[in-house]
Amino acid sequence: LGTTTVECKSGYGLNKESELKSLKVIDEVNQSHDIDLIATFMGAHAFPPEFKDKHADYVDLICDDMIPEVEKQGIAIFNDVFCENGYFTLEQTRRILNTGRKHGLVPRIHADEFEDSGAAELAGETNSISADHLMAVSEKGIQAMIENNVIATLLPGTTFFLGKSTYAPYKKFKKAGVDVALATDY
């Protein structure tokens, strides 16, 4: 059977035009072969240089302009945010995910990759379909994921690629009853 489905994300242009272009390309390529491509809008992957000191303005752009246009064009299923200290805060992430949900996008979170930021707990609070990475997830985060059926998406290749030694606690997730998915991050 092999690979049947691949998730593809935007999040590398970090402006409206580039984000929409990435999602349109995913949609067009999806029409041309048998592997299902699932598009995820990830305008909240990082802050572009022009918003270095204007984070609130970039979050406004995502919520007030990008997400409504993604919905209008019907070019994504999921909405993902990189919720981590130094990136998007819990409050910014909550706003972006709730806005996405109002526009028909299913929430997901890049959570607790470098330290426990409370993002796994937020994944539970926002009823996200999944929380990705989770190398520094807390017990409270695991509990919130259990209570809200959040899938733990583990990406061991990221740990290896970054030269880190800490992997997501697979055995804790399985013992706790959290559904686990494995992904490559590529």
Regions found by a protein language model. Name each.
Residues 1-6, 127:
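Short intrinsically disordered, low-complexity coil segments enriched in acidic
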Residues 4-117:
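Metal-coordinating catalytic core of metallo-dependent amide/deamination hydrolases
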Residues 106, 116-186:
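Active-site-adjacent C-terminal substructures of enzyme catalytic domains
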